[in-house]
Amino acid sequence: MRERTSVQTGIVRGMEILRLSPSRINDFLNCPQLYKYRAIDQLPEPPSLEAERGKLIHSVLEDLFELPASERNLQSATEILPERWQRALQENQELQSLVTDEKEWLDRAQALLTNYFSIEKPHTFESTYREIHLEQDLTDEIYLHGYVDRIDIAPTGEVRIVDYKTGKSPRAGYEEKALFQLRVYALLYWKNHGVLPTLLQLLYLGDSQVIKSGISEIQLDATDRKLRNIGDEILSAISEEFFPPKKSKLCDWCYFKSICPAHNR
C-alpha cells in the first residue's frame, strides 16, 4: 500500500489523495463548512467532556478483554477505571482543567460501565480484535479508513462488528446514521478479509440499549457506491473551494459558530 500523508488531503507521489473516515463523512454531510474547518484547515478544537469520557470508557473495555474470561466482570472494570483515568491525565494535561469535579466524572463513567454489563456478558465469548484500524483504497483518489471498537469472530466463522456509544440510543426510525458507520466498517472488513460480516451491533451505554442489524452484499455494494459519490462531492468541493455552511440545531454545539459565515453576515 502506498505511503500516506498525515493530513486529510495531500499530495502522495504526485497524486492528490482524499482520506475518508466515518467521522469526516459525517462532518461533510452535516455541514460542508464544518468539514472544511476540520479536514482542510485543520483548525484546533478544545477537548469536550463527552469525547474524553468516551475515550476513557473505550480504553477500560479494551483492557477488560485482555483479561481471562473469568475475570471480565464489573469489579475488574471498576478497578481498571481509575488506572486508565490516571493514564489519561498524564497523557493529556488539559483534562485537569476540563474536569472540575473528579468524583462526579468518575461516578458517571462508573455508571456507564455498570450499564455495559447489563447488556453484554463479556465472560461468555472471546473478542478477536479491539480498536483495530481498517483501511482500503476505494479509488485512485479516495482512501477509506476507520477504527473499529471490536470485532468478534465466532468459532463457526461468523463475524460481528461492535461499536460502543456512551450516549443514549436514537429514537426509533433514526438509527440509520449510526448503522451507516458500521456498514462502512463492514465494507472495510469485507474488502480486507474477503469475509462478509454477519452482524452489526451498537451498544448504547447511556441508556443500556442495543441496536442490531444484519448485513448483505447488496447493502455493502450500495454503501460502496454511496462512499464513492460522497468522495467525489468532497473532491469537487475542494477543487471549487466551495463549502457552503448548512444551518441546523447542531450549530449551537459547534465550536466554530463564532467564525462561521452563516452566523456572521
PLM segments and residue spans:
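Charged, compositionally biased N-terminal leader segments and the immediate start
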Residues: 2-23
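Nuclease catalytic cores
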Residues: 25-26, 30-69, 106, 110-114, ...
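Metal-dependent nuclease catalytic regions and adjoining charged, substrate-binding loops involved
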Residues: 5, 19, 75, 156, ...
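Short acidic (Asp/Glu) and glycine-rich catalytic loops that position anionic groups and cofactors
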Residues: 34-41, 58-59, 88-90, 162-166, ...
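A non-catalytic, helix-rich entry segment at domain boundaries
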Residues: 60-130, 137
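Mg2+/Mn2+-dependent nuclease catalytic core
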Residues: 132-225
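Short, polar/flexible loop-turn hinges at active-site or ligand-entry regions and domain interfaces
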Residues: 42-50, 67-72, 98, 171-172, ...
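Short beta-strand or tight-loop elements
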Residues: 21, 126-132, 144-148, 247
